[in-house]
Amino acid sequence: MLKFVNISKQNEDKISLKERKKYFEEIYINFAKEKANQQASRCSQCGVPFCQVHCPLHNNIPDWLKLTAENRLQEAYELSSSTNNMPEVCGRICPQDRLCEGNCVIENSGHGTVTIGSIEKYINDTAWENGWIKKECSLWTENLKHRQHLEGGLKIHGTVLQAPNI
C-alpha cells in the first residue's frame, strides 16, 4: 500500500536530441511492463483522490492505477476508456503536471508524484498492440455518385445514412 516510500518516482526515458533530429517520433521511450507496474503501485489509494477530482474528465485514476499494478491491463484500459473517448491522446498531451499529477497526495508529502500520464500512455499503447481497442463504425458513409466534367474534376458525393438498430 505505501510503496511510494520505498519506490522512487521514475519518468519515461527521453530520447537524446541527437537521435530525435533524425526522425519525427515521440521523444519518450514507453515504460516497460515492470516499470509501469512498479510506478502504478506507488499510488497510495488515498481516501479523497485529488488526482481524480482535478482531472477535467474525472477519470477513475486510482482504480486503473491499481489494476495496472496488479497487471490487469485490459481491465485498466476498459476503465480508462469508460470516461475518456481518447485516453491514448490524453496520456500524451494532457498537462498532468498541473492537473492530476500536480494534485497527487504523495507529491505533496515529498515522495514525488505517481507518473499518471506515463502510465495512462502505457495502458493505451498496450491496448493498441493487443487489439483490445474496438473499431466503431460511423453512422454515415459516403459513396461517389459521379465526377463533374469540369476542370479539376470535382467529385459529387452522396451521403447515405445507415440508421442504428434501435
Task: Tell where the protein language model's regions lie, with residue ranges.
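N-terminal Rossmann-like FAD-binding beta1-loop-alpha1 element of flavoenzymes
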Residues: 142-166
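Ferredoxin-type iron-sulfur electron-transfer modules and their immediate structural context
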Residues: 1-145
